[in-house]
């Protein structure tokens, strides 16, 4: 008798439901419904409402926290769901983390410091994750080393390059700026992809920055900025201080316009600060943290804010995984 393989499906917790639905549509996959039942005292239970036995399941959860659901609570709910799916006999449980909270703490900077990203990796593995797909994690090397299960590290850079080529003034003299030394490699990759696809000359600059107890200092700008458009690129905007500091330095260096492109915006206050900064002409972000930006803020931004969906990137990745196609091309050029 031929073996029957049940179809793969996407699973999403309520706080990530819109993102999970969008990823399922992009991937052409069905959904596995779950029950989320709260109890008094903050306790809850999670269980699949259909058979999970033998199925490959893709579990979507952004770990960007809010006042109502902090990152720690979202992580705990994800862990409980993974254990429930494992107990229900799911064959594979691949976690999709559009935003990986706790990933910034990937090394020790003081005695007895925790390496929190590794602790989270151990929790996910213990709960039954069989694979993980992340997006623009703060330190890709630390991300890879933290896990023993297979991982895929996606990048929003090709999407951002495509957006800039088709929706921004890509014909201007442009310099890609890293707001700190640690982001130079990211800025260099963006510059190379943009130059290759536009056929034009794209400059590279970086800002020397120091951070101590949350205070950003330093401001030496290395690179050609005067008379050019500066595109400040970063993986994450928390408070907005670093990006605003870099934008001001670019203006002082003679940039005619300063644009900002960032993947993750886990705090609404950070986006609000960018919108309120007079030195910044335009801001491009992704929705990796889900629908956290209030409509009032989006209206206040008018045409100064572009919001790029990450569901097509995750959906295309799942399609390629399920058809044994390579994922690497998605990291080099966004499909037209």
Task: List each model region and its residues.
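PRPP-associated nucleotide enzymes
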Residues: 1-336
């Amino acid at each position: 008798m031929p073996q029957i393989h049940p179809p793969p499906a996407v699973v999403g917790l309520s706080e990530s439901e819109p993102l999970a639905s969008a990823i399922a549509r992009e991937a052409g996959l069905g959904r596995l419904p779950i029950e989320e039942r709260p109890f008094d005292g903050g306790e809850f239970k999670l269980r699949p409402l259909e058979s999970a036995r033998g199925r490959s399941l893709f579990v979507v959860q952004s770990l960007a926290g809010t006042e109502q659901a902090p990152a720690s609570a979202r992580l705990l709910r994800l862990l409980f769901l993974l254990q429930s799916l494992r107990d229900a006999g799911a064959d594979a449980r691949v976690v999709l983390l559009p935003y990986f909270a706790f990933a910034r703490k990937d090394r020790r900077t003081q005695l007895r410091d925790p390496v929190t990203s590794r602790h989270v990796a151990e929790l996910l593995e213990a709960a039954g994750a069989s694979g993980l797909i992340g997006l623009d994690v703060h330190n890709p090397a630390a991300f890879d080393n933290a896990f023993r299960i297979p991982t895929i590290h996606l990048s929003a850079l090709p999407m951002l390059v495509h957006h800039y080529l088709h929706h921004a003034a890509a014909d201007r003299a442009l310099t890609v700026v890293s707001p700190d030394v640690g982001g130079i490699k990211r800025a260099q990759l963006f510059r190379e992809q943009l130059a290759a696809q536009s056929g034009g000359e794209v400059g590279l600059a970086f800002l020397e920055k120091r951070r101590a107890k949350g205070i950003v200092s330093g401001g030496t700008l290395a690179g050609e900025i005067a008379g050019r458009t500066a595109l400040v690129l970063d993986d994450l905007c928390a408070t907005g201080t670093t990006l605003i500091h870099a934008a001001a330095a670019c203006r002082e260096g003679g940039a005619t316009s300063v644009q900002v492109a960032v993947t993750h915006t886990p705090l609404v206050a950070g986006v609000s600060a960018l919108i309120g900064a007079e030195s910044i002409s335009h801001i491009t972000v992704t929705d990796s943290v889900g629908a956290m930006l209030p409509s009032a803020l989006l209206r206040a931004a008018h045409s100064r804010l572009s919001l790029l969906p990450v569901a097509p990137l995750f959906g295309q990745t799942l399609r390629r995984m399920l058809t044994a196609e390579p994922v690497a091309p998605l990291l080099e050029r966004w499909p037209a």
